[in-house]
Design a protein with these regions (language model features):
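Bacterial Sec-dependent N-terminal signal peptides
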Residues: 1-29
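Long, charged/polar, surface-exposed segments that mediate recognition or autoinhibition
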Residues: 83-141
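Short, low-complexity, Pro/Ser/Thr/Gly-rich segments in the mature regions of secreted, periplasmic
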Residues: 158-172
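Short beta-strand element of the conserved SAM-dependent methyltransferase core
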Residues: 70-75, 138-145, 168-170
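N-terminal leader/targeting segments
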Residues: 22-94
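Hydrophobic, Leu/Ile/Phe/Ala-enriched alpha-helical segments that form helix-helix packing faces
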Residues: 13, 48-59, 117-125
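Short, exposed beta-strand-loop hairpins at the edges of beta-sheets
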Residues: 145-162
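Short amphipathic beta-strand and strand-loop transition segments with alternating hydrophobic
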Residues: 62, 127-129, 152-156
Length: 172
């Protein structure tokens, strides 16, 4: 009988501890504009890899092209009972001279998230192919060091209309 109570205590402690560790996060953390511009300055996939994993992203695929390599990371999230996959692509030139960060999601309104952070940037005319699409609304910004494209694309989903948000950050 002496061993019964401590055994029950430890079993309950183990069950409650594991329950607390498995709760699903209700927040979906995205990097700030300052963080995105810092990453674009890295020109190093290794440094980027360490920091993006801290936000819950996992490496998915590496794609080599003629002048650059793209590293794609994904994060699966559930918000209000709906499953989403966030994607971030780190593209770096083969000579490590430039890099571009591209983030695509439907889980969070990136326009609302990033617009207040872009007050120090100049709003410029968008010349990107995405901005010319009639279903896409884009705002383009520039500072002395970076160019940022922020888009809200109306897409037809199988269960109705939805938004797909896109932000791209490049060092000038």
């Amino acid at each position: 009988m002496k061993a019964f109570y401590p055994t029950i205590y430890f079993v309950l402690l183990a069950i409650l501890s594991s329950y607390g560790q498995n709760t699903t996060s209700k927040t979906n953390t995205f990097p700030t504009v300052a963080t995105l511009t810092n990453w674009a300055n890295y020109n190093s996939q290794q440094k980027f890899d360490l920091e993006i994993r801290a936000l819950g992203f996992k490496f998915e695929v590496k794609e080599a092209e003629t002048s650059s390599i793209a590293y794609t990371y994904i994060r699966k999230v559930m918000i209000d009972g709906v499953n989403y996959t966030d994607r971030i692509v780190y593209r770096i030139t083969n000579d490590n001279s430039a890099s571009i960060i591209t983030l695509v999601t439907a889980s969070t309104d990136l326009v609302t998230l990033y617009n207040p952070q872009l007050t120090a940037f100049n709003n410029v005319k968008c010349e990107t192919p995405m901005a010319k699409d009639k279903n896409t609304s884009c705002n383009c910004y520039e500072s002395k060091t970076h160019a940022i494209d922020l888009c809200d694309e109306r897409v037809k989903l199988t269960m109705g209309d939805g938004n797909k948000y896109f932000v791209s950050v490049a060092k000038i």
